[in-house]
């Protein structure tokens, strides 16, 4: 399994010119945040990995929207969301147009927290005191998952269930010293 995040260099695809360039650019282009890289880097690194290594599952978590929200830059927050839509569409369109991947690859996209959405001035924040910040969105699309579109009025799903869901999708026996949730039943056909 490959995990890569933040300002961490991507060492998996040695010799891939685009990945090597991104690794250099991550350290040469100033990022306004201490431990977060631009989402474009995450997208291109993951897309190159997907094409080269053919994983059965790709988990994506982008950070740009969170950082722009904390900074109060609503315009950049919206631009970032729009770019993410394009990145996700590019990956999924490529997966579906490639017979080696179509109906074989699962994509999971989520975030680690929600945002304050009840009181306008709190949209920049999250945490236990901010109403709405415990609610996150989760997108799972793949061959094992029914195509249901947006699900509303269902039993709650929790972030603690994602690890066990990934383990089942990959047919891996997952153990953790900390308590984890059960698999998300609605993900499976």
Locate the predicted segments by residue:
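Extracytoplasmic/secreted proteins, especially bacterial periplasmic and envelope-associated proteins
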Residues: 20-21, 41-45, 76-79, 83-90, ...
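Metal-dependent active-site segment of extracytoplasmic phospho-/sulfohydrolases and closely related
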Residues: 83-124, 166
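Active-site His/acidic residue clusters
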Residues: 46-90
């Amino acid at each position: 399994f490959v995990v890569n995040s933040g300002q961490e260099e991507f060492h998996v695809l040695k010799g891939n010119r685009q990945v090597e360039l991104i690794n250099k650019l991550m350290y040469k282009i100033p990022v306004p945040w201490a431990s977060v890289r631009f989402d474009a880097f995450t997208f291109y690194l993951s897309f190159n990995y997907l094409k080269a290594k053919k994983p059965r599952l790709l988990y994506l978590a982008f950070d740009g929207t969170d950082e722009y929200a904390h900074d109060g830059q609503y315009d950049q927050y919206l631009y970032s969301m729009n770019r993410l839509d394009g990145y996700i569409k590019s990956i999924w369109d490529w997966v579906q147009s490639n017979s080696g991947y179509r109906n074989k690859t699962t994509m999971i996209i989520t975030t680690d927290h929600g945002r304050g959405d009840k009181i306008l001035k709190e949209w920049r924040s999250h945490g236990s005191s901010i109403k709405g910040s415990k609610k996150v969105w989760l997108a799972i699309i793949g061959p094992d998952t029914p195509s249901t579109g947006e699900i509303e009025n269902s039993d709650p799903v929790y972030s603690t269930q994602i690890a066990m869901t990934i383990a089942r999708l990959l047919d891996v026996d997952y153990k953790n010293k900390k308590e984890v949730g059960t698999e998300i039943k609605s993900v499976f056909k």
